[in-house]
Amino acid sequence: WGMDVYGHKDSKLLDGDIKLWIAKGYATSQETATLAKSTYKFTGTPNTELIVDLDTVAKSIEGKAEVLDTRSPDEYAGKNLRGNARGGHIPGSVLVEWKQNAAEDGSFLPASDLKDLYASVNIVSGDEVYTLCQTAVRATHSWFVLSELLGYSGIAVYDGSAIEYANREDTALE
């Protein structure tokens, strides 16, 4: 997601965890890499269509966009506050924990399974969807699944996520 926001379209993501990597016989190393200092400077324009803010998410409660909460069930239910002032979830949001996108070895589920998973909470191709979690890390995983693996358009990350939303007194939570 971050790479796409800043215009880097040819980025790659490891499909699976390190145990799967090793099981497939790929090389690993215990050496610390030495990298040359970079002079790279971003000169483009960030793709703000991939980011939504608090106001946009708050308006979605009454609007047509789906809010996809990717946190744990305990966070969604308000049982685990993760240091936030308040717990719970945005009214009308749906829960698909980010971990549900992957098999036990960390590899992504087949596209047909992922489509079924999201259809079970009424998220389908063509929907406008805003993903969130606590700090927009897990939310980007689900953004990748919806945007890149399933090819859905209209998917954006609420960068402020729960750390912003649940620490304000003027936002609705259930």
Predicted regions and their residues:
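Terminal peptide-recognition signature
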Residues: 3, 69, 93, 136, ...
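Active-site neighborhoods of enzymes that stabilize oxyanions during catalysis
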Residues: 19-91, 170-174
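Short, flexible loop segments at boundaries between secondary-structure elements
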Residues: 94-103, 160-164
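Structural recognition of the beta-strand scaffold that forms the well-ordered cores
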Residues: 12-13, 66-69, 95, 128-132, ...
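Thiolate-centered catalytic microenvironments shared by cysteine-dependent enzyme domains
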Residues: 1-51, 79, 138-155, 160-161
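Helix-loop module immediately N-terminal to the HCX5R catalytic loop
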Residues: 98-129
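C-terminal soluble interaction/assembly domains
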Residues: 116, 126-162, 166-173
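Short, charged, surface-exposed secondary-structure boundary motifs
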Residues: 23-24, 103-106, 165-168
